[in-house]
Amino acid sequence: MKRLTAVIYPGETGRWFVAFNPETGTTSQGRSVEQAVKNLKEATELYLEENELPERSPAFLTTFEVALA
C-alpha cells in the first residue's frame, strides 16, 4: 500500500471536480470531491498495472507571484 497525492480543482461550472495525481500524472473527474478521488484512485491503479511508480521526491505545494498587466 502506498499513500499518493490528490490535487483537486473545481471545474469551471462548479458542477465537476478534477483530480490530479502528480506522482503518476493520472487525472480523473467526478461530480463531487469524493467521486473525483474515487475515480482518480481507479485510474491510478489501472496505470500502475502497466507502469511502475516513478521514483520521485514527495510532492509539495508552494506559492509564487506574477505581475498582472
Q: Language-model features: where?
A:
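Short, charged, surface-exposed hinge/linker loops at domain edges
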Residues: 1-5, 13, 31-34, 38-69
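Short aromatic-glycine-(Arg/Gly/Cys) micro-motifs in beta-strand/loop hairpins
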Residues: 8-23
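Short, well-ordered beta-strand elements within core beta-sheets of diverse protein domains
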Residues: 26-29
